[in-house]
From Swiss-Prot:
Brain; predominantly expressed in normal neuroectodermal tissues and in certain malignant tumors. It holds the Pfam family WKTW_rpt. Sequence repeats lie at residues 3-8, 9-14, 15-20, 21-26, 27-32, 33-38, 39-44, 45-50, 51-56, 57-62, 63-68, 69-74, 75-80, 81-86, 87-92, 93-98, 99-104, 105-110, 111-116, 117-122, 123-128, 129-134, 135-140, 141-146, 147-152, 153-158, 159-164, 165-170, 171-176, 177-182, 183-188, 189-194, 195-200, 201-206. It comes from Homo sapiens. Residues 141-176 are annotated as: 6 X 6 AA approximate repeats. Autoantibodies against CDR1 are found in patients with paraneoplastic cerebellar degeneration. Residues 3-140 are annotated as: 23 X 6 AA approximate repeats. Residues 177-206 are annotated as: 5 X 6 AA approximate repeats. This is Cerebellar degeneration-related antigen 1. The gene is CDR1. Keywords: Repeat.
Length: 262
């Protein structure tokens, strides 16, 4: 074949003449550099410097002290804030102002005496309004559920209510009062004082004077009816089902301070 005739041509390949060039590789010229001790010392010195940089950084006492100080400052900032007596006093002051202001204000005997005095004055004003209707006019009437029923309702609520020292109020037991207004006006301290102050006779009077369930006193204009429970049932309900602890739990948890404020 024709390609077999080229075998003799392969024997005369010029690449075979380049074999002596492999012996003169220029990379072998760097061998004296590696054998140079000074060069090796420089390389070792560079490696030592590169390795010792971190070591010197870690062994630097001043730098470590600075790191410790910075970490201590970062950690102590919160501690100093919590341990700061001024900040704690401010927080305590805010708590006292927000939560305890009403209780301290209501526990003040002078304030309680002033409230009792105003209640007496309001009652006297009611009596005066009944005795002197010409001077007071329609302001003396109690409104929609007044002394004479709905027939005497003037149609003008602002003129139908009773005006006391504190303006138009709708407390229970007043003329034109509403028991819900009186209940939500009470704070937790007042509730506790009011409930534990009640005796069994007081509870019986309050329960049997309700108009529809445990709704409080209806006032002079409403009908006074007895509840469907008998005295024995109410006595059992008060004595056993609602004990002292149950009342305290009911006031403390079911009606919290936030719920009462709302």
């Amino acid at each position: 074949m024709a390609w077999l005739e080229d075998v003799d041509f392969l024997e005369d390949v010029p690449l075979l003449e380049d074999i002596p060039l492999l012996e003169d590789v220029p990379l072998l010229e760097d061998v004296p550099l590696l054998e140079d001790t000074s060069r090796l010392e420089d390389i070792n010195l560079m490696e030592d410097m590169a390795l010792l940089e971190d070591v010197d950084l870690l062994e630097d006492t001043d730098f470590l002290e600075d790191l410790d100080f910075s970490e201590a400052m970062d950690l102590r900032e919160d501690k100093d804030f919590l341990e700061d007596m001024d900040s704690l006093e401010d927080m305590a002051l805010l708590e006292d102002v927000d939560l305890l202001e009403d209780t301290d204000f209501l526990e003040d005997p002078d304030f309680l005496e002033a409230i009792d005095l105003r209640e007496d004055k309001d009652f006297l004003e009611d009596m005066d309004s009944l005795e002197d209707l010409e001077a007071i006019g329609r302001c003396g009437f109690s409104g929609r559920h007044g002394f004479f029923g709905r027939r005497r309702f003037s149609g003008r609520p602002k003129l139908s209510g009773r005006l006391g020292l504190l303006g138009r109020r709708g407390f229970s037991g007043r003329l034109g009062g509403y028991w819900k207004t009186w209940i939500f006006w009470k704070t937790w301290i007042f509730w506790k004082t009011w409930i534990f102050r009640k005796t069994y006779i007081g509870w019986k009077t309050w329960i049997f004077s309700g108009r529809c369930g445990l709704t409080g006193r209806p006032g002079f204009g409403g009908r006074r009816r007895f509840f469907w429970k008998t005295l024995t049932d109410w006595k059992t309900w008060i004595s056993f089902w609602k004990t002292l602890i149950d009342w305290k739990t009911w006031i403390s948890f079911w009606k919290t301070l936030i719920d009462w404020k709302i």
